[in-house]
UniProtKB/Swiss-Prot annotation:
ATP binds at G157, G159, K160, T161. This is Chromosomal replication initiator protein DnaA. Residues 71-112 are annotated as: Domain II. InterPro entries: AAA+_ATPase (IPR003593), Chromosome_initiator_DnaA (IPR001957), Chromosome_initiator_DnaA-like (IPR020591), Chromosome_initiator_DnaA_CS (IPR018312), DnaA_C (IPR013159), DnaA_dom (IPR013317), DnaA_N_dom (IPR024633), DnaA_N_sf (IPR038454). Its main location: cytoplasm. Domain I is involved in oligomerization and binding regulators, domain II is flexibile and of varying length in different bacteria, domain III forms the AAA+ region, while domain IV binds dsDNA. It is found in: Cytoplasm. GO terms for molecular function: ATP binding; ATP hydrolysis activity; DNA replication origin binding; lipid binding. Gene3D superfamilies: 1.10.1750.10, 1.10.8.60, 3.30.300.180, P-loop containing nucleotide triphosphate hydrolases.
Amino acid sequence: MSEKEIWDKVLEIAQERISNTSYQTFIKDTQLYSLKNDEAIILVSLPFNASWLNQRYSEIMQAIIYDVIGYEVKPHFISEDELASYNNVNTQEVQEPQVQHSSIDDKTWGKEQFNMHNTFDTFVIGPGNRFPHAASLAVAEAPAEAYNPLFIYGGVGLGKTHLMHAIGHHVLSNKPNAKVIYTSSEKFTNEFIKSIRDNETEAFREKYRKIDVLLIDDIQFIQNKEQTQEEFFHTFNELHQNNKQIVISSDRPPKEIAKLEDRLRSRFEWGLIVDITPPDYETRMAILQKKIEEENLDIPPEALNYIANQIQSNIRELEGALTRLLAYSKLQGKPITTELTAEALKDIIQSPKSKKITIQDIQKVVGQYYSVRIEDFSAKKRTKSIAYPRQIAMYLSRELTDFSLPKIGEEFGGRDHTTVIHAHEKIANDIKSDPTFKQEVENLEKEIRNQ
């Protein structure tokens, strides 16, 4: 596979996993400059974009690249301005990536896993994250003595990964010889599958079970993966029985993770479950002010106020808006004002009717309307009282979100994409033939948009 083919596939996956705004603004036009020495050099247009991507998207891009090429490399974003100095240091000819022979090569338990910017010192505390921050700090100070496991859940871009990295940094600062692993459930799954294929399951288990702290991100992705759940169940048990700390993150609480074995769900609930909610106005302003201080930027308070008022969904999009503004100002050659800020962000400012809708939002509203439990949308039950609302929720998921058909199917218990297509066609036909039902669906859509 050529480097161009690799990067085309990476971008294809990134478009599914990263918000459309962030993908279009920062990821879409990136180029793979080189792939060698366990490092992927990725070219972007502006230095600030490179800095922001290295801080915020390194982990997710690392996981995506791993999924494509089958071995781990560290992504490093550089701007065109930095390219000359990079070439001076790295004069070797770019080589085609070579597949490594072992999936269990990485024995690094150190700080190299963690984003250097994601520490407790850089975490801005507000009402929506005060409790998760306190719980994370307690775990980092005394692993396996405070809350075990610690389960952190909340929407995308609210700081779950930041807290997990902060825990890793803190543990290793206090105990440099501690064995700490940070991974995602997708990476855990991929390594597990590869270990079976390469007959290296014992090495895989040694890696994940003979450690002091396990930090595992996005655990919801192990739903429907029976063998992975079985493996993680035994990994969890061994770590917990040996008094080792486990920290788990998810976009939803354990009880709402469909197709999760009950024995795993109950173990996730053994310790402390904390949720992170979107930041309030004061927290959003504090985040922006901290960011411009870190980057030594000069931005008028009224411009920050505009961003904080308009971007309310999550921290990632808040910082993304700031990055977009800086890029727009530089490319236009104009000073930053409130007017320029509005102009720069006009394509990403979300009105109440165009705010980002999740499949969970849709399931919640449809479930309440038809008296269907959230977990029943993912169950195998085919009674009409459940199956028909499920089809309505699938229809609305396709109409109101940008998620792919496989992703929608995954959120409804791992159903095939053809099931989603059938549901959409059926509900669309029923809407055409039944004016009363059409009004019912329109009311549901209005309620979903106004959440």
